[in-house]
Amino acid sequence: MPFWKRKSKELGTPAHGPDFSDVDTREKALALVEKGQLEPLYLMPPEFGGAEDPRNIVYVPIGIADIKRSTDLNVIAPLVESGDLQNYSAVPEYRGRSFIPMAIKIEASDPKRFECEINIWGEALDRETELQRPDSG
């Protein structure tokens, strides 16, 4: 789902994991950054030409930015340097009116393709559990 489209339906409390449903403004997110609960994450990293711009920054629980940065620098950057990838996007997926993304989908392509999703909270964590279940067939 593109970042400018948010699910309008109120979803209630997530089944498990953290709940950022009430963090519905940038100001509330920045207050949690000040408390040490959230950190900024660059969608397009500075190493790839990403700007220091509020539209390029989302706020996530501590540690998530390191996971994305590691993926960008240790997986994608070498593939870009070898000519295997030329296009890059990192798209946040939101839950309800929350300002905190519940997942970030990273895609890089041309001529090869790389995709991954960083699941952060809410239903995105359920998707992660579904992927880990053994095939029951």
Where do the model's predicted regions map?
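Glycine/proline-rich, flexible active-site/cofactor-binding loop segments
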Residues: M1-K28
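Domain-level detector of nuclease and nuclease-like folds
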Residues: D19-G137
